[in-house]
Design a protein with these regions (language model features):
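Active-site acidic catalytic loop and adjacent metal/ATP-binding pocket
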Residues: 70-121
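Gram-positive cell-envelope targeting signals
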Residues: 1, 45-46, 61, 107-109, ...
């Protein structure tokens, strides 16, 4: 990420066309989808095991999701995003272990099909979420990942705040409900 901005040849129209989805809009849409699914499932006469569990835990998950949406609106995210677009910060879009090749002490990132110009913390968030899901949300590992990342590219307070809000959002619950 340190070197992934101000790509030569990018013009303003390119940045606008390649801009990622505004996280405020994304969380609002996800929350709307969660409510829509809840309404649909609640109206069903016969619920399967997943649907019954969804209804049972929806209230607490909804509170968590709405809190993340509210916090994002109250932070400096808008300025963070504006800066990312002005600087032409490149996000991979799918920065997960499947797209990282390590050989001979060097790492190569592949598959940039979903790249965008956006807040680079989105990539770190996705990577951390995927790794931490597989490691039972080990907080020590999360701190170590942040420390290691910060040694290469120091994180500003507003970036850490944004990352924390993204990690707060019940993304896995939303994904399960939608698929």
């Amino acid at each position: 990420h340190r070197d992934m901005k101000q790509v030569p040849g990018f013009e303003r129209k390119d940045v606008e066309r390649l801009a990622g989805i505004d996280a405020r809009e994304e969380l609002a849409r996800h929350n709307q989808e969660l409510r829509k699914i809840y309404t649909f499932v609640r109206r069903k006469n016969r619920k399967n095991e997943f649907e019954a569990a969804y209804i049972q835990c929806f209230s607490s998950i909804r509170e968590e999701a709405e809190r993340a949406e509210r916090l994002l609106k109250e932070t400096s995210y808008e300025a963070l995003r504006r800066q990312a677009l002005e600087e032409g910060q490149i996000c991979h879009g799918e920065y997960i272990h499947h797209n990282l090749l390590v050989a001979g002490g060097h790492m190569t990132v592949i598959n940039f099909e979903k790249f965008s110009v956006d807040v680079q913390m989105n990539d770190l968030y996705l990577f951390m979420r995927k790794v931490l899901e597989k490691q039972n949300y080990d907080a020590r590992l999360g701190r170590k990942m942040l420390k290691t990342y910060s040694e290469v590219r120091p994180l500003r307070d507003e970036e850490l705040e944004y990352l924390g809000i993204r990690l707060l959002y019940p993304e896995k619950f939303w994904k399960l409900a939608n698929y």
